[in-house]
Amino acid sequence: EAYAFGL
């Protein structure tokens, strides 16, 4: 869920 951290 890296997208949740904007990575």
UniProtKB/Swiss-Prot annotation:
Modified residues (Leucine amide): 7
UniProt GO cellular component terms: extracellular region
Keyword match Glycoprotein: no
Keywords assigned by UniProt, alphabetized: Amidation, Neuropeptide, Secreted
Top-level lineage group: Eukaryota
GO biological process: neuropeptide signaling pathway
Subcellular location field: Secreted
Main localization (coarse): secreted
Protein function: May act as a neurotransmitter or neuromodulator.
Recorded family membership: Belongs to the allatostatin family.
Name assigned to this protein: Carcinustatin-2
Species of origin: Carcinus maenas (Common shore crab)
